[in-house]
């Protein structure tokens, strides 16, 4: 699944987590790890605007040959992160960044994949689900992801969609939507 996020070199080991709560990275509270990277005190990550900024720096967790996104949706008072999807202990996680261009490229890649799966049939409806962080990244270019999809599928195909708190893709076997 195309997601538009790229690793920037920082790698961490998830040393303590439980379901959707990411407690520690490399043995330190998750907010302390982000504080060291971005230069703001760890206690400030629990409050706006930094609590919102954390969403723009998700973690990529290896699954097969790709990185799946795990985004902090809330920074807790104890310095842990409430994530958009479960994170397992012991996995390696990579700090990710995105940009308008990478989001547009990912949208075009996803549209191209969808078109290939239609095997020559013309799409009658496009349903777009994008991570809420894209809305934050594209705030100065609203609709950029829609235009990118229309560049591939055409402007005459009706569109519907919305923002999600994670990657939702068609299942490989059944085609049933699944949260990665």
Residue ranges and their predicted role:
Residues 1-139, 143-157, 162-180:
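Small-residue-enriched flexible segments
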């Amino acid at each position: 699944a195309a997601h538009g996020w790229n690793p920037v070199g920082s790698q961490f080991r998830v040393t303590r987590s439980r379901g959707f709560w990411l407690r520690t990275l490399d043995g330190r509270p998750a907010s302390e790890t982000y504080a060291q990277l971005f230069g703001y005190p760890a206690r400030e990550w629990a409050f706006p605007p930094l609590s919102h900024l954390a969403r723009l720096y998700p973690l990529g967790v290896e699954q097969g040959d790709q990185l799946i996104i795990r985004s902090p949706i809330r920074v807790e008072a104890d310095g842990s992160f409430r994530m958009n999807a479960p994170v397992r202990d012991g996995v390696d996680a990579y700090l990710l960044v995105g940009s308008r261009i990478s989001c547009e490229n990912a949208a075009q890649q996803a549209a191209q994949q969808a078109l290939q799966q239609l095997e020559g049939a013309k799409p009658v409806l496009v349903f777009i689900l994008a991570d809420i962080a894209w809305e934050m990244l594209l705030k100065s270019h609203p609709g950029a992801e829609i235009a990118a999809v229309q560049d591939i599928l055409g402007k005459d195909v009706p569109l519907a969609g919305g923002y999600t708190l994670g990657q939702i893709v068609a299942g490989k076997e059944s085609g049933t939507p699944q949260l990665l």
